[in-house]
Regions:
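NAD(P)+-binding Rossmann beta1-loop-alpha1 motif at the extreme N-terminus of oxidoreductases
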Residues: 1-53
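Rossmann-like NAD(P)(H) cofactor-binding subdomain of soluble oxidoreductases
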Residues: 36-38, 46-49, 55-60, 64-112
Length: 112
């Protein structure tokens, strides 16, 4: 299983640390390079981390997508990203509801 994180802040860092220190099976974790300091630190700490500059490449590569950006950034970037129906999308975006997110990503994915 490949996991992808759009947004690289405290939430992403905490979730990835939890995943990497657990018994969850995964092949690779892709993180956006939005916050270089945090993404480089994660890559240094955990060997299965890859940093990606292009959010669409993260979505194209992963079956689980974690959205951890601010609401303003989410509204700006999500409309241009192309998700697949077989992906699971997990959103940490505080003010974007699941029905709103479904309209933005335009695909019948599982959204949590």
């Amino acid at each position: 299983m490949k996991l992808g994180f759009i947004g690289t802040g405290k939430i992403t860092s905490s979730v990835i640390t939890g995943i990497c220190n657990s018994s969850i099976k995964y092949n690779r974790i892709f993180v956006s390079s939005r916050n270089n300091k945090i993404s480089k630190n994660l890559k240094k700490r955990f060997k299965k981390i890859s940093i990606e500059k292009n959010n669409q490449k993260i979505i194209d590569s992963c079956s689980w997508i974690f959205l951890a950006v601010t609401p303003t950034v989410g509204k700006k970037i999500l409309k241009d990203l192309k998700f697949r129906s077989n992906q699971t999308v997990i959103s940490f975006i505080s003010t974007i509801t699941i029905p709103q997110l479904k309209k933005m990503i335009k695909v019948k994915s599982d959204i949590l």
